[in-house]
Structure formats: C-alpha cells, structure tokens
Amino acid sequence: MKVSTATARVVVNVDGGARGNPGPAAIAAVVRAADGTLLEERGERIGEATNNVAEYRALLLGIERAAALGASELELIGDSELIVRQVNGEYKV
C-alpha cells in the first residue's frame, strides 16, 4: 500500500536487539499512517551483531520502508537512547 498525498506523514517504530553483545541479532520496523493505520511491518534476523548495530539497522529499515511507501515526513520512535540522541544531534560520534 502506498501512502497517499494526504497521508504522506508516517509514524515509524523501530527496534533492534542482540542476545549477547555481540550475539544473534534481529531488527523490526512498523510503519503507520499518521491516523494509526498499519501500512507495513517488517522483521528480520541479521546474524551476529552488537545491540547498537541492530538498533541502527532497524532505524535504516524503518526509513527505507517509509520511503518505499512514498512517505515525505517521518516521526521516528525507538527505545535506544544512543540512536535517539544521535539523531537529535545531542550525541556526536
């Protein structure tokens, strides 16, 4: 389902994690229209990774899926302090 021009704003929830650090890791992204309508959900195993790598891969997956759906404005939601603060320019790498 493509995002209509009227709903070009989407909300993207992302999460990634590893069992062990590093260890077997997985990522997920859920894309919803601004009104809450589910547009897409994806999850995948990514092999061995650290928790931070998994969180970043989840962020990229969410952004890629939103772009593929035609979104022009994103609200990104995640639980990684590192990712949130880096994206908001509070942490420098």
What are these regions, as identified by a protein language model?
Residues 7, 20, 24-26, 43:
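Extended beta-strand/beta-hairpin segments
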Residues 27-31:
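Short beta-strand scaffold segments in enzyme catalytic cores
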Residues 32-38, 79-83:
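Short connector loops/turns at beta-strand edges and beta->alpha or beta->beta junctions
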Residues 34-54:
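A short, polar/acidic, helix/strand-boundary loop motif
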Residues 53, 57-61:
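Short amphipathic alpha-helical face segments that pack within enzyme cores
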